[in-house]
Amino acid sequence: EIIFNGDLVNRKPPHQRARSGIGYVPQGREIIPYLTVEENLQLGLEALPGGLAKHKKIDELVYELFPVLKQFLDRKGGDLSGGQQQQLAIARALLGKPKLLLLDEPTEGIQPNIVQDIESAVKRIISETGVGVLLVEQHLHFVRQADRYYAMQRGGIVANGPTSELSKAVVEKFLSV
């Protein structure tokens, strides 16, 4: 069971999870490739009460976090690079005004300079919006920016604690290949 704000959410359909305050960016991004950047962003507004009919304006914060999106509003999502698609997916999730943002491997397969942009954006999201972030990530330098860590093997938690206490032994035992 997954309970968020006292509400059982794991059996709810995605749109109800979004309306309950959870933003989700899946591994692999899952943007809509045949929609424009702007249309993909508008989908994020659907999570708000009243949906797109009531909320038509894209929050400027997403363009501050990911300036490339403003330049490519008319471009199809499928024409963006992988890193740009990831930025679009995170921005779309943010537009639903989540209380919790779930990011599943947001830097997987992304070129290093875009990884830095995404890391910087996530830091800003945490510090400026009050949104909680649950990050599934393999890049240890990014993980170390979190408050807590959980190491998993075969779907179970095998180690956890404050990230400041993430030891070399734990890294070698559970996080090394």
Residue ranges and their predicted role:
Residues 1-20, 49, 163:
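ABC ATPase NBD Q-loop/coupling interface
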Residues 12, 37-57, 65-67, 161:
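ABC-type ATPase nucleotide-binding domains, specifically the catalytic core motifs of the NBD
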Residues 93-94:
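ABC ATPase C-loop
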Residues 97:
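Conserved catalytic motifs of ABC-family nucleotide-binding domains
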Residues 116-129:
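Helical segment within the ABC ATPase nucleotide-binding domain
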Residues 149-161:
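H-loop (His-switch) and adjacent beta-strand-loop-beta switch element
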